[in-house]
Amino acid sequence: MSEVKNRVCLVVIDGWGISNESKGNAILNAKTPVMDELCALNSHPIEAHGLHVGLPEGLMGNSEVGHLNIGAGRVVYQDIVRINLAVKNKTLVENKHLKEAAERAIKGNGRIHLCGLVSDGGVHSHIDHLFALITALKQLKVPQLYIHFFGDGRDTSPTSGVGFLQQLIDFVNKEQYGEIATIVGRYYAMDRDKRWERIRVCYDALIAGVGEKTTIDKAIDVIKGRYAKDETDEFLKPIILSDKGRTKDGDTLIFFDYRADRMREITECMGMERYKDLKSDIKHPKDMQVIGMTQYKAEFTFPALFPPESHKNVLAEWLSVKGLTQFHCAETEKYAHVTFFFNGGVEKQFENEERCLVPSPKVATYDLEPAMSSAGVADKMIEQLNRKAHAFIMCNFAPPDMVGHTGVYEAAVKAVEATDIAIGRIYEACKKNDYVLMVTADHGNAEKMIAPDGGKHTAHTCNLVPFTCSSLKFKFMDKLPDREMALCDVAPTVLKVLGLPLPSEMTGKPVVIEV
């Protein structure tokens, strides 16, 4: 078992951002003597949103992503960001599974199909990803490429499909590569409620060309004719543009939607045995290979271009590897965050990791009991601090976030004050039992309770969050050389204070120096 230089108590406040705007700021306007003292004593604001935490640029942080980054000690990129970076950096051509698909096609029948939702809605897919895949497959010298266009009209205007089709036609013509083979609405291609009769319409079209036959030069007029009859993008019945572009024995199919829920049924029918449920008269092609953009379901047998990343040696695992004991505590609303998410997105409880769940109050909305169970969480933490059994203990305080979401400003002020009182009690116990108290937050919320139009603001924010350290043996750096400080730096900083080495997998940096 490793020896530690200092024992650490980490508090993660949910929804506590930093803002100088006083209007509607439940944090600035609340009485928070403890956090005021800790921030004045030794602290540095850190980033908790957007690319800093692996989310798309400019997107506000959330509790799941926040705790994942805090516990992992690295930026954990979401699937969409990993894909966007590959597209932006033109590295799709180096993707292992895409190269394998290309090799399979070249050695086999020479054919690959790209299937997915073609729009810029950005909820399930993005047309830019399709363009990047076409370019990459051309570079990989796949002889024949067929594209199956699923119409959107839900995350985009109901009649915007002709515009996206024109963009695709122009791109294919410019590249002189690829052939658009099928057009079908997402109503048939992307069902998620086991309405197999809908999926069958898409299935029969992809394999057997069941649908209205036309040519690519007439496709836009055909769709406009459908619009005139109130058949919009989502509900487009199959339009077949190429007999050669049907899915055949030995073909490779790549589905390019990154969101899983509406890809499961169609991919399971094309790539596994589920097609039998469709009761289709069409003969299922032999030896087809299906590939997803992401993992659509853990049980599916086919690969993904961007499989889930496993996060080895997150803080909790590393402490366990070093033979140290730890304690994680939260009330019901945030229990998953201090366990599953903090531990790198795994259910597993590591060796010598103790957990404690404090029940959240049973009220209709938390503005009715703004302190929530903050006192109960503090009680459990103080018990552990007095035991001095663990090298590392951590907890989450839910009130600023959960009450912030109600939009009730006065209640949010009370939530913030209750949280400050709870942290104060923990701080006293830390001093008594020789623990270093470190406080941070997963994202902002309660500092913005009023929207620009004067209405309630109930969402998270993109504001910085505090990161404090109660020991003056450690001083925060002014800045990092190459980037802003962010949540990924919390775990490495905790390890620095504990006096432990960092695992190689942690790419975050300790942001304190010993003085």
UniProtKB/Swiss-Prot annotation:
Classification via SUPFAM superfamilies: 2,3-Bisphosphoglycerate-independent phosphoglycerate mutase, substrate-binding domain (SSF64158), Alkaline phosphatase-like (SSF53649)
Residues at which Mn(2+) 2 binds: D14, S63, D442, H443
Temperature dependence per UniProt: Optimum temperature is 32 degrees Celsius. Active between 17 and 32 degrees Celsius.
Single Gene Ontology BP annotation: glycolytic process
pH dependence: Optimum pH is 7.5-8.5.
Keyword line: Glycolysis, Isomerase, Magnesium, Manganese, Metal-binding
Listed InterPro entries: Alkaline_phosphatase_core_sf, BPG-indep_PGM_N, Metalloenzyme, PGAM_B_sf, Pgm_bpd_ind
Keyword Magnesium on entry: yes
Summary of activators and inhibitors of this protein: Activity is not affected by 2,3-bisphosphoglycerate.
Pathway(s) annotated for this protein in UniProt: Carbohydrate degradation; glycolysis; pyruvate from D-glyceraldehyde 3-phosphate: step 3/5
EC supergroup of this enzyme: isomerase
GO cellular component, one term: cytoplasm
Matching CDD domains: iPGM
Record-linked Pfam families: iPGM_N, Metalloenzyme
Protein role: Catalyzes the interconversion of 2-phosphoglycerate and 3-phosphoglycerate.
Family: Belongs to the BPG-independent phosphoglycerate mutase family.
Descriptive protein name: 2,3-bisphosphoglycerate-independent phosphoglycerate mutase
Native source species: Onchocerca volvulus
